[in-house]
């Protein structure tokens, strides 16, 4: 007789059976998959013992290949071999063509302006290409673990915006994977090192991969990982080192700038090989397109020094955001294959005043951290005391009257988080409100980034200031934002999930935080002026309504005094003198006090008409 299998609701029927989870580092140049086995996190290798999977896909009419096989076709079939697709994720076609004008692919724009790559397999978008890489990694994990994955944690750069994060999730779904969560790459590295060393204090995670740079300042204390600040550049990485060196080799060899794609690929391959060799050797011989020459490490360092300096400027900004000095940082974790470049390690060590940590393979550390987190989230370590707190990189807020930005969630707030603020109507009888969601650090709308707009309709027709609208911002663990606006008395609401069609540009990423510091004093003055102008408009709007309703309560002389005060306020409100506007508002208030008192008395008399004192 078979036994009846009983389990608690929501739990596995076999509660002690280990669930299969993996951490995936979906990188620009290379990707990895890792898992926890026998209590140890490890990356999984292919049949030839290779842990890295080149993030390259080669498409043909009858199928595609991923990884090393695809990379060998890069020089032979450039148009159908897609590499560094992570850089294209969440970007518009116009943005890609401006940012990467020399890509060997042919693009078409979809109806909404997103890029479609022409291949032998048809038109493909970056999400589909990323999904094919994820499928290859998942297949490696499934084979190694002898079972289907119950869930994965996928890492993304800390500076990925909502569109890029959503694109990563969409790619995972297309690959048939259940995403437990997205995890910032520097945070994943902190998990790996934090568990291994148990170090407490402030740690900097310097992550220089193939296509992105991230710097995170974290505090580790008693198993708690708190991200104090983040910074970086979503379009700076080792690929840029490669292209600079390739351009240098092309100039030395006298190869035309607009040579065919095959030669361009040969140049890039030669540059990559030279870069790797120069990590150990002081010079290297390069052979390309019939040219042979010598390149020294000193020449390479001179080429990349400006890019390394850019990363250190981002480090300085992140430290300032965190309120931490460089000498307070206990350890510096190096992440990403590009941190093997000697100049990078040297300059980072000089900046922080200590040698950086490289005890965990910088190519593998992110995947290892993701695997540890996946093992916890899938339920294999339910008693884990580790707490992970990510942050949002830029403030989120709303546009208010006068073109001002009201910050609802400040930057570097830990996520997930939900914050709400109450707003009200500006005009009498206002029945709708436009909600404009902003991102950035400046005080004025014109200096911040627009994320989304939506409207709340069905607001009760009440006097100005009578309706109360609560706007709630909610950022989930993956950094995706949803905004809800609700009118309190009726419960009517509207909401939106913010998924911009493409990401921040280089200049926006680099300058938004910097500008907020450079223009801080100017912005405060501009905000004060805008606030006074809004208050002046509100006072005049209210006064005009009152005069239209109860002008009979005033004598001709009294009306003239009020009209003169209002005209003066209207005139000075067109200027830029904050004090003059403030004094004019006070003057209108002073000249209308008796009028306001008479209106109040009249309202009371009307309310009491027909009622006895006892009834009241």
Curated annotation (Swiss-Prot):
GO terms for molecular function: ATP binding; ATP hydrolysis activity; ATP-dependent protein folding chaperone; unfolded protein binding. The keyword Nucleotide-binding applies. This is Chaperone protein HscA. The keyword ATP-binding applies. Chaperone involved in the maturation of iron-sulfur cluster-containing proteins. Has a low intrinsic ATPase activity which is markedly stimulated by HscB. Involved in the maturation of IscU. Keywords: ATP-binding, Chaperone, Nucleotide-binding. Belongs to the heat shock protein 70 family. PROSITE patterns: HSP70_1, HSP70_2, HSP70_3. It comes from the Bacteria. It holds the Pfam family HSP70. It comes from Escherichia coli O7:K1 (strain IAI39 / ExPEC). One of its GO terms (biological process) is iron-sulfur cluster assembly. The gene is hscA. SUPFAM superfamilies: Actin-like ATPase domain, Heat shock protein 70kD (HSP70), C-terminal subdomain, Heat shock protein 70kD (HSP70), peptide-binding domain. NCBIfam families: HscA, PRK05183.1.
